Amino acid sequence: MKLKLLLPIIFFGLLSTASAQSLTVATYNLRLFTASDTGNLWVNRAPVIAALIRYHDFDVFGTQEGYQNQLDDIIKILPQYQCSGAGRDDGKDKGEHSAILFKSDKFKLLNHGDFWLSQTPEKPSLGWDATCCNRICSWVYLQDIKSKRKFYFFNAHYDHQGNIAREESSKLIMQRIKTLAGNEPVVLTGDFNGDRSSTWYQRIATSGWLKDAYTQVKYPYANNGSFNNFGSNVKSDEVIDHIFTTSNFKVLRWGLLTDSYHGKYPSDHFPITAQIELK
């Protein structure tokens, strides 16, 4: 009799464990490929970045600034990841990407897309008061192969100069997320070029349906700012890279990773990571 009573408890306990799988997500500005980075060249940084990703075991993560050759280098070292995202200059492979990488043995790619942070989001274009560069947001719709749970993952890189562009980017991204994802679980990552006091950050964080993962944990591992400028800005506490989630997720941990090698940093940004769980 006792065994009969215990079996349903064990069964439902196993179901609960399976449906509550945690994911390690992250956002990481890789720093673009440029020969002017004397002492911090991509050829030296790439294997360190790959080792960092492997060690911290990111399941899904958004990248910023990566050129196609940089993303190819990461995938070559870490073939367990699949990459999705278009180049911001031509919608194919030219220019910086806001690419998303995910473990191909853990997730099935159901859909994906890109849109530009501009008044003409369907084609490569400058937005509002931005004068330097096209800005792009990439997204994927993933299904966890084991649990069958589905979620959307969006990743963006905001303009570094135009205040109007950053404000409007937040509006556009939230509109697109609502249109594409509806009430489904969503993770939004990116380099927002603004800390938690910026109005474009606040527009998302106070929206009522997307919350900063940092604010959802009791003990965030926040030991620095996220832009280190290859070491010349390490005393800053300003975090401009963020992870947002909808209420479908429980945030278990949040951390800013300050890994270094031989006294150097693998990028001019520190990656932000969060352990999250679909409710």
Predicted regions and their residues:
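Catalytic metal-binding/acid-base residues of hydrolase active sites
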Residues: 31, 67, 157-159, 192-193, ...
